[in-house]
């Protein structure tokens, strides 16, 4: 495997709307981000991934782009953005931008033209179809509830939108559209950015004819994902993008890919194939949902998590590269999800960080994760802002599902869990804004905030800092091979990494009960040292056998015998 900077990096995701408000309007902005760069430098991250800051009507918080080459007024100006890039580079960090090209806003100039007439030169930049028997062209559901088609009276046809009706899908079969996209990507790269995170990039190729999905009783619209995820031309498009754009720069690329399998990821990230560096897969964050999808709650089984993460670790070894993440702007907070955000918040957050960051791949930290921010439990649906949450609530209430049932799902899985503003200190609104925040701050900001974390040498923040530092000091964390141990243990997630005559042993108690670790005989470390632990007081005893306290994590490094 070749050495590239993105393999040795740790990435920090900023959701600009919720990070830091500078001008007091209650909305995070670019000058706010600039004011916090020294904090990120202290943490030690190498790369900042900036969620969309492009001009947008904000139907889906910036993932509906009106102008790919302009900055959203609420966030600042292009001059502010250029200052941000320069300040990031001055501090020895890099910047990757969100690339949202499965769809645009319905207010984008291309779509405004496209809907004017059937023979408009921009008509085929989008996916237009006549209705079928007085109804939509097919039975696909939008990811945000309802039909994936909207009727447009001007031309009497429907346009496809896999997300909201203000996010029409772009037609990647049109070579002119692809040229425009590549030109726009090149424009940003020439400004000096260091790569892209590509939003739902495996949705861009649809199956010819856009066939109906398998109907389901009582459901007028059903997921058409079999016909647009990982579609027939996806590899062709990505290889063309690589040839026209990506190969000309020293970049990091990561493709967000719902429904991607390991076998497909081997193709998307295979070093010989010239597509992407890595993908975001969703297998491990789907393990706590029932058969009816995201809002259908079920407890996580540790054995499932071990099997899933280990399969991806082994499956991309020597072929491609893994992304490592627990959190992002669409996922609930990990300490609330897989940890204990009450009795063992600090211990479980550190354990989950250790478990992930010692694996092979590029770790991604989402803002607030490094201080153990938790899910929020708003009482009223009016307190929520997320379009996915609000549409789901409205649809399910109309079907007679009780308010309490829906709120339990929203408290566990709603995207606003990740979007409550960053908690900087104990002052009003957590130091995020002097105005009224666009989304309420989690009421626990007085106990959980950056100021408190920086004062406490045992905070979650310093544990993340240590994990990032260890990755820089020990090549085994970047390059070592991965093997799961104690596969059937119901409470311990343990694995080893091996590289260059060294073995790293990672042992994590996944629960709030005491449990005993017995190291398998085949794992032998000579001259072992305890590199990291999330408990203060030293317990005597060797790496071969010890008692694990609630959510305890230990990392040992030794030589191979």
Curated annotation (Swiss-Prot):
- CDD domains membership: AmyAc_SI_OligoGlu_DGase
According to its UniProt record, which reaction does this protein catalyse?
Hydrolysis of (1->6)-alpha-D-glucosidic linkages in some oligosaccharides produced from starch and glycogen by alpha-amylase, and in isomaltose
Query: Where exactly are the transmembrane stretches of this chain?
Result: none
Q: Where is the active site?
A: 199 (nucleophile), 256 (proton donor)
Q: Which InterPro entries match?
A: Glyco_hydro_13_cat_dom, Glyco_hydro_b, Glycoside_hydrolase_SF, Malt_amylase-like_C, O16G_dom_2
Q: Does the keyword Metal-binding apply?
A: no
Which GO terms of the molecular function aspect are on file? alpha-amylase activity; oligo-1,6-glucosidase activity
Q: In the Enzyme Commission scheme, what number(s) does this protein have? A: 3.2.1.10
Write out the entry's keywords from A to Z.
Cytoplasm, Glycosidase, Hydrolase
Tell whether Cytoplasm is among the UniProt keywords: yes
Sites marked Transition state stabilizer: 330
- Which EC class does it fall in? hydrolase
Which protein family is named in the record?
Belongs to the glycosyl hydrolase 13 family.
UniProt name for this protein: Oligo-1,6-glucosidase
Species of origin: Halalkalibacterium halodurans (strain ATCC BAA-125 / DSM 18197 / FERM 7344 / JCM 9153 / C-125) (Bacillus halodurans)
Classification lineage? Bacteria, Bacillati, Bacillota, Bacilli, Bacillales
Gene encoding the protein = malL
């Amino acid at each position: 495997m070749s050495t590239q900077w993105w393999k040795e990096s740790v990435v920090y995701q900023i959701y600009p709307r919720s990070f830091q408000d500078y001008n007091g309007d209650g909305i995070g902005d670019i000058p706010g981000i600039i004011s916090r760069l020294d904090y990120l430098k202290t943490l030690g991250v190498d790369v900042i991934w900036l969620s969309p800051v492009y001009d947008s009507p904000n139907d889906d918080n910036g993932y509906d782009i009106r102008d790919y080459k302009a900055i959203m007024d609420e966030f600042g100006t292009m001059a502010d953005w250029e200052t941000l890039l320069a300040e990031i580079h001055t501090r020895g960090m890099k910047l990757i931008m969100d690339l949202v090209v499965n769809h645009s806003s319905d207010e984008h100039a291309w779509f405004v033209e496209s809907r004017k007439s059937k023979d408009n030169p921009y008509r085929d930049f989008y996916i237009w179809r006549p209705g079928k028997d007085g109804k939509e062209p097919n039975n696909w559901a939008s990811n945000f509830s309802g039909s994936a088609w909207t009727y447009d009276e001007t031309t009497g046809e429907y346009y496809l939108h896999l997300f909201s009706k203000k996010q029409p899908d772009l037609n990647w079969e049109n070579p002119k559209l692809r040229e425009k996209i590549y030109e726009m990507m090149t424009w940003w790269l020439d400004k000096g950015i260091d790569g892209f995170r590509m939003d739902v990039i495996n949705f861009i190729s649809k199956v010819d004819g856009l066939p109906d999905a398998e109907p389901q009783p009582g459901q007028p619209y059903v997921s058409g994902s079999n016909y647009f995820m990982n579609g027939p031309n996806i590899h062709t498009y990505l290889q063309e993008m690589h040839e026209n754009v990506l190969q000309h720069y020293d970049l990091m690329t990561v493709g967000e890919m719902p429904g991607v399998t390991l076998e497909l990821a081997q193709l998307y990230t295979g070093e010989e194939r010239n597509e992407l560096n890595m993908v975001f897969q969703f297998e491990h964050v789907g393990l706590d949902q029932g058969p009816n999808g995201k809002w259908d709650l079920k407890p996580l089984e540790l054995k499932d998590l071990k099997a899933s993460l280990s399969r991806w670790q082994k499956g991309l070894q020597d072929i491609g590269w893994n992304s490592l993440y627990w959190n992002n702007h669409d996922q609930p907070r990990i300490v609330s999800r897989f940890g204990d955000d009450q009795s063992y918040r600090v211990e479980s957050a550190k354990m989950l960080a250790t478990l992930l960051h010692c694996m092979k791949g590029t770790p991604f930290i989402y803002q607030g994760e490094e201080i153990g921010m938790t899910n929020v439990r708003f009482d009223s649906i009016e307190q929520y802002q997320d379009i996915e949450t609000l549409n789901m609530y409205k649809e399910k209430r109309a079907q007679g599902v009780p308010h309490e049932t829906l709120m339990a799902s929203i408290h566990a899985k709603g995207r606003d869990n990740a979007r409550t503003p960053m908690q900087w200190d104990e002052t009003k609104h957590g130091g995020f804004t002097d105005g009224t925040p666009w989304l309420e701050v989690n009421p626990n900001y007085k106990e959980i905030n950056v100021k408190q974390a920086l004062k406490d040498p045992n905070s979650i923040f310093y544990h993340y800092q240590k994990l990032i530092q260890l990755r820089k000091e020990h090549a085994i964390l970047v390059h070592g091979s991965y093997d799961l141990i104690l596969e059937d243990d119901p409470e311990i997630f343990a694995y080893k990494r091996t590289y260059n005559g060294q073995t790293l042993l990672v042992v994590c108690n996944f629960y709030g009960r005491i449990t005993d670790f017995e190291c398998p005989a085949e794992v032998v470390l000579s001259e072992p040292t305890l590199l990291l632990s999330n408990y203060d007081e030293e317990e005597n005893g060797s790496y071969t056998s010890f008692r694990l306290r609630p959510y305890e994590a230990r990392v040992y490094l030794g030589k191979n015998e």
